[in-house]
Regions:
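A conserved active-site cap/scaffold subdomain adjacent to cofactor or substrate pockets
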Residues: 70-140, 156-158, 162-163
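Active-site-proximal loop->helix
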Residues: 3-17
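Short acidic-hydrophobic, aromatic-tinged amphipathic segments that line or gate anion-handling sites
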Residues: 21-26, 142, 147, 162-172
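Short acidic loop-to-helix transition motifs that present clustered carboxylates
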Residues: 1-7, 25-33, 195
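C-terminal core of ALDH-fold dehydrogenases
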Residues: 178-292
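Structural motif
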Residues: 20-23, 44-48, 52-53, 69, ...
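Flexible, glycine/charged-enriched surface loops at secondary-structure junctions
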Residues: 44, 104-109, 129-140, 154-158, ...
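Conserved NAD(P)+-binding/catalytic subdomain of aldehyde/semialdehyde dehydrogenases
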Residues: 16-107
Length: 292
């Protein structure tokens, strides 16, 4: 924390997990210490976890010297909701994303403008009920008129909250799937009657929360999914932090004499095509041994 103390809950969790070595440091300087090593901090092989812009830049600069998980940006959620969804629940999920700080993005893909308005009103009510916001923040919850963006209509909902719905003549489900895959959200919530069917069209998302009873908040704390997820569209090519981040795959190859004899002729042709004569010779020596 800002006072230099380590959160007691973090220390307790570390102890329960068998961690017996904890270093109290943070920021870009922590990344440098872990990557290069110091008199008190041993050098590591992998650095994981999100941070601010300085931490991201530090991780980018040491990548190659050590492995990193990702360059995590501001948190994101995209909620896809049909007409059967509960606007108040959707509103609460969007507002929860704002709690991750400035830059956090919360998007809604809705079936029509009426649903967007209902969610906007629910946001106003929830902000007034739960947050006791200042007049400045309360002013953000007004719902301005829509702006057409072609096949999809965008409607600001307030702050970093934005809602979209299909333009006239556009089908909701295909457009929603296209938005999901183009945006590649960190968190994707599906408030849909047939959420499982919609899943077949989803190719890019960090974590997917299926059904109206599965908000992102459960994934943040207790559902068991990892909270360190790809952001900024990187879900198109990256995955969540997991045990696999800390594992390395190795190829183990072993041939007996007979196998070497069978594989040497095709290897020789491939090697010759590239002009790698010693690759061919290396293999043919084993083939000759197999023939004896």
């Amino acid at each position: 924390g800002r006072d230099g103390a380590v959160n007691e809950s973090v220390l307790a969790a570390a102890w329960l997990l068998g961690v017996r070595e904890v270093y109290r440091l943070g920021g870009a300087q922590a990344v440098a210490a872990l990557a290069y090593g110091t008199g008190t901090v041993p050098r590591v092989d992998v650095i994981t976890g999100p941070g601010n812009a300085y931490v991201n830049e530090a991780k980018r600069q040491v990548f190659g010297l050590v492995g990193i998980d990702s360059l995590a940006g501001p948190s994101e959620v995209l909620v896809v909701a049909d007409g059967q969804a509960e606007p108040r629940w959707v509103a609460a999920d969007l507002l929860a994303q704002e709690e991750h700080g400035s830059g956090a993005q919360a998007l809604l893909m809705a079936p029509d403008e009426d649903f967007c308005r209902a969610v906007g009103k629910a946001i106003e009510v929830l902000r007034a009920e739960r947050c006791a916001l200042s007049d400045t923040l309360a002013a953000h919850s007004a719902v301005p008129g829509p702006a057409s963006t072609g096949s999809c209509v965008a409607r600001p909902v307030g702050g970093n909250l934005h809602a979209f719905y299909p333009a006239l003549g556009q089908e909701f489900a295909p457009l929603a799937a296209a938005l999901v895959n183009a945006y590649g959200p960190e968190h994707l919530e599906l408030h849909l009657q047939d959420a499982r069917a919609f899943l077949s069209g989803v190719a890019s998302a960090g974590a997917i929360f299926v059904g109206k009873h599965t908000p992102t908040a459960f994934g943040d704390y207790v559902a068991g999914s990892n909270h360190v997820l790809p952001t900024g569209g990187s879900a198109r090519f990256a995955s969540a932090l997991s045990v696999h981040t800390f594992l390395r795959r190795q190829s183990l190859i072993e041939l007996d004499a007979a196998a070497a004899g069978r594989l040497a002729p095709p290897l020789a042709r491939l090697a010759e095509s590239e002009g790698f004569c010693f690759h061919r010779i290396s293999a043919e020596m084993r083939a000759e041994d197999a023939a004896e």
